Amino acid sequence: MAKYVGAHVSASGGVENAPKNAQAIGAKAFALFTKNQRQWKAKPLSKENIEKFNEHLECCGIEKKHILPHDSYLINLGHPEEEKRQKSLEAFLDEVRRCEQLGLDKLNFHPGSHLKKISEEECLDRIADAMNETLRQSSGVTLVIENTAGQGSNLGYKFEHLRYLIDKSIDKSRVGVCLDTAHMFAAGYDIRTKEAYDKTMQAFDEIVGFEYLKGMHINDSKAKFASRVDRHHSLGKGEIGLDAFRFIMNDPRLDDIPLILETIDDTIWDKEIELLYSFVE
């Protein structure tokens, strides 16, 4: 069984540092921001950034297909105001181009929020339009939609939202999904027992389909079940408990995709990675 576990590591000081940070915690996969995620604008990646990134990647033996870049949290492709949506779209395109430059084939993003100004469907249509515009203007990068906890006016908390965006897509070969365990749980999808896990994963397969699953975020949840609150926790310390992660590590449908920790204490990521691998039966 081939599981590729890692964490969302820092790219502080340059993207080329991310592979080294992943290697330091014993990761076989990783996520990163390819630019400062708190700013709209960022200076372009230099030739040196790109060359060193590739060099460091080779040294640490992590394959590009096991890297899941994440876009900036500022981006809202479903923004109700056209000017702000346009700003988000331009920033999103820039993120996709950065992935292209680094030879990375995925970009993970949160779908968007209606800010209580438009309906959920209108918001989903805006997100779908932005995705299609991005697909038209780029190549080689799969847009990976993350499920959300449904906090505030964030969409993506139902599997049906993810399916809707896939259905509206002009190129389904370049769209995928990332499942975040904490978000699933907070949105009302239980994974705490084998029975609950199987039921949730069956629903995911029927509504979205495992062929679209391009990665997972492995998090426990501080927030209660179905609370629609997005609060991550260290594995086994939250409301989900360790069994769910044991089910994940032994589920062959989750082979060969990046399984990324975004748990709250980065000083124990190496231990959490070890723990997850120890679950493999």
Curated annotation (Swiss-Prot):
It is an enzyme of class 3 (hydrolase). Zn(2+) 1 binds at residues 70, 110, 146. Its cofactor is Zn(2+). One of its GO terms (molecular function) is phosphoric diester hydrolase activity. CDD domains: AP2Ec. Its EC number is 3.1.21.2. Zn(2+) 2 binds at residues 146, 180, 217, 262. Keywords: DNA damage, DNA repair, Endonuclease, Hydrolase, Metal-binding, Nuclease, Zinc. Zn(2+) 3 binds at residues 183, 230, 232. InterPro entries: AP_endonuc_2, AP_endonuc_F2_Zn_BS, Xyl_isomerase-like_sf, Xyl_isomerase-like_TIM-brl. Binds 3 Zn(2+) ions. One of its GO terms (biological process) is base-excision repair. It catalyses: Endonucleolytic cleavage to 5'-phosphooligonucleotide end-products. NCBIfam families: nfo, PRK01060.1-4. Belongs to the AP endonuclease 2 family. Endonuclease IV plays a role in DNA repair. It cleaves phosphodiester bonds at apurinic or apyrimidinic (AP) sites, generating a 3'-hydroxyl group and a 5'-terminal sugar phosphate. This is Probable endonuclease 4. The gene is nfo.
